[in-house]
Amino acid sequence: MNTQNFCFVLKQNSHLLREGCFGLEKENVRVNQDGTLALTPHPAVFGDKGKHPYITTDFSESQVEMITPPLPSVGEALGFMETLHDVVTENIGDELLWPQSLPPVLKENQEIPIAHYSGEFKDKEYYRQKLAGTYGKERQLISGIHFNFSFSEKLMDILLKSGVCGNSMEEVRETVYFRVVRNFLKYRWLFIWLYGESPLAEETLNVISLKTGEKQPMKCGVSLSLRTSPLGYRNREEFFIDYSSLEAYNMSIDKLIRENRIDGPHELYLPVRIKFLEKDNGSPSYIEVRIVDLDPFTKSGVCASAIYFSHLLLVYSLLKEEKGSLTEEELQRATRNQDMASCYGRDEKKELKCCSITVQQKATSILEDMERILSEYGVLDDEIYRQEMQHNLYLVQNPEKRIGMVLYENINRVGFVPFHLEKARQYREATISGGYRFHGLEDMEMSTQLLLKAAILKGIGFEILDRKENFIRLFDGKKEEYVMQATKTSLDSYVSVLMMENKVVTKKVLERAGISVPGGYEYTSPEAGMADYRLYAGKPVVIKPKSTNFGLGITILKHNYDETDFKAALQIAFEHDNTVLIEKFIPGREFRIFIINDEVVGILHRVPANVTGDGVLNIGQLIDMKNEDPLRGKGYRTPLEKIRKGREEEMFLKQQGMDFNTVPKEREVVYLRENSNISTGGDSIDFTDDIDDSYKAIAVEAAKALNVKITGLDMMIQDIHAPATPDNYAIIEMNFNPAIHIHCYPFKGKNRHLNHKMIRALGF
């Protein structure tokens, strides 16, 4: 390979060096509330562990493994993993996810259940039984993170077309990935020295010595990462793998298999692996970095800085000049340096096995070279990567600030089990209180985020087709469904959606079906509406666009004595449509009834946007304070919406003789709107189990009348306990795109899990 030309092509396409596919795999041991190993089976809610693409088991039945799909950025991979962590946490009852790579409390003669498999996957269980006999169950219980990375396909295509490193895609992949691995193996000690996070084990933990076969305490030197030390996840013997070429690599592994020293490539516990996929014709597909410890300071267990640095080190390994091979002596030296970083990483004055230089001095030299080369190729033009590079330079100059050092001090101060147990409890609480998010996709509507979380639980794949429009594809190998904004699906016909969108048509169809709706008239201009003002003066009315959703453009005038307010309400409605309805206001409380496939699956009473006075702050200030609640946001990305301070709110306050500067009395509740949509700042209260069944039956009949399978139906009810009559209720609206998140995370009441019910309705 012509190195000069190779580097020239990379520099010409440096913007592609940061791109690629990124994936994470993570294991956590399930523990009881006291920190002991949970002996319950892998939760059945996750389905078949042999087939689930995201959630399975590792060595032990008590050890959950979480796997992200390949994603286009480190940030999205981190977000997906945190979401997986939340999904698992939400479905293991009172159990906790142990946040440390090293095992929790293991009693004397502790039972450590091997992961159970059946049917076509039974061989996985047999393989684990063999590992238990060879390495001991305690060692196999050590958990960690694998970071998977492949370079951009665009970059690979450009390298192929340039001819600088091969005449076929297979040759290009071989050249690129083997070059990266050779360099990464030499520098891996630096990653461990910066980001090792398993400095101490529980005092009673003993593991089988790989040399003598006898049990020994899990301790070595002034350790920083016992997981990556000789006491951690290693093979019985140190193998020499030839990384000079794909052919040499395969030959060295085949030799180990023939000599019965390993069962197959999967038993090579290497710090970094080259992975192969059939789609790439047996050539390297991606690199798996296996030396990342769990981070007890992060809920997901994945330190973002560690992953970003790993990516930078991989890119640096591509750009850094090297001779094209590693001798056995060089590989041994690299392993000794890994052992030094693992076992003596807390001593920054320790010398490396290459030269008479301290680890801190060598780390500084490498990081400065990384900064120079990565800057030269434009990799650090990205703000995130530039900050991460600066962070690592700071750590090498302030080694006591390394995360493993901080962890060591905390364990020494609090104790191994108490420290990690408290973290596990904190993270469980954080998930339970804020688990509505799909991390990394927070810019999408919350209903879509929740639907995707339900898909993860079921092991359903998904593709985001249009992020801004919340348009996704769901698939599982048997079928696929296209969904927009969580509830626009193939279950409903286009004409049914149009009927719901058009409030005039909705009313006419429901009237023909014998269902009560408000009386009123439609107008095609503000002037026509104003001409009939005397018809409505002094009577409570609702003025709304003919086609509306989410309560947009709706004004309720309960008293309607002010012609100016009537005119303003008409103007607001006409801003949203060219036809407006003026209807009789129906007394009672408004309820949102959600229907899926002719079944009522959730009912909410929505309290209009409101504030409660304290005798000091004015209404505007009280709104600002209430909007600080983290559950409130904008654009349907949180369970509740922020309260607005717009014309509609101003008009409603005026009708009450108030404005935004009015100071309410202490405990006085002031309403900002008459309509109770969550989308305009209202509060949601679950009433699914409280309303008389007659109203539910009417709601289902209404859905059938419009031939719709998914709808959010708004019904006014005077007395929820009295059976329905033609005069004590009315359906005021049927929505074709109802939000599901308000039923999943109501202000008060049960989570009705509409995201999971939507997944079932779609046939998954």
Named regions from a protein language model:
Residues 9-11, 106, 117-137, 141, ...:
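Loop-rich catalytic cores of soluble enzymes, especially ATP-dependent carboxylate-amine ligases
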Residues 1-38, 42-55, 337-457:
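Sequence termini and other peripheral, non-core segments
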Residues 1-132, 139-143, 165, 179:
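Terminal catalytic/cofactor-binding subdomain
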Residues 255-268, 313, 572, 576, ...:
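A long amphipathic alpha-helix within ATP-dependent nucleotide-binding catalytic cores
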Residues 97-102, 329-331, 580-584, 591, ...:
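A short glycine-rich, hydrophobically flanked beta-strand micro-motif that places a catalytic Asp/Glu
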